[in-house]
């Protein structure tokens, strides 16, 4: 089965694992997923991730989810820009998520970064997802 939107698949896996209170979740590896996971780790939404390579299988990322008082740190994660409807935002159109408690993850000409990093770099781009 082919996967039309790998990033949406990763987001769904993270959501489902957090709802089931799993400590780890795995997802197929890709460069875009690695960059999004880097942003999530830097912002403190996940503990980290590691690349797992098994002989004869595709490489996977094993993501360690983060919890606080038994509740997932990621309360909500949603895909914004989809293959059928791309969403782009300029620097002045980037609004804070949940009064600054959440982040947007953008794909910019300078790489994948959070909305605060994009404001600091004065660059806009495609809004991949929102996390809070």
UniProtKB/Swiss-Prot annotation:
InterPro entries for the chain: Ribosomal_uS8 (IPR000630), Ribosomal_uS8_CS (IPR047863), Ribosomal_uS8_sf (IPR035987)
Protein keywords: Ribonucleoprotein, Ribosomal protein, RNA-binding, rRNA-binding
GO terms, molecular function: rRNA binding; structural constituent of ribosome
Cellular component terms (Gene Ontology): ribonucleoprotein complex; ribosome
Record SUPFAM superfamilies: Ribosomal protein S8 (SSF56047)
One GO process term, biological-process aspect: translation
Subunit structure: Part of the 30S ribosomal subunit. Contacts proteins S5 and S12.
Function comment: One of the primary rRNA binding proteins, it binds directly to 16S rRNA central domain where it helps coordinate assembly of the platform of the 30S subunit.
Homology family: Belongs to the universal ribosomal protein uS8 family.
Protein name, per record: Small ribosomal subunit protein uS8
């Amino acid at each position: 089965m082919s996967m039309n939107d790998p990033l949406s698949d990763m987001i769904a896996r993270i959501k489902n694992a957090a709802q089931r209170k799993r400590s780890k979740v795995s997802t197929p590896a890709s460069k875009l997923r690695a960059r999004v996971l880097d942003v999530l780790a830097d912002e403190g939404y996940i503990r980290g991730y590691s690349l797992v390579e098994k002989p004869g299988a595709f490489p996977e990322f094993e993501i360690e989810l983060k919890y606080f008082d038994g509740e997932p740190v990621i309360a909500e994660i949603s895909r914004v820009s989809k293959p059928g409807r791309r969403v782009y935002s300029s620097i002045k159109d980037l609004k804070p998520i949940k009064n600054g408690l959440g982040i947007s993850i953008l794909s910019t000409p300078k790489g994948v970064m959070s909305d605060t990093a994009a404001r600091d770099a004065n660059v806009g781009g495609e809004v991949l997802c929102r996390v809070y």
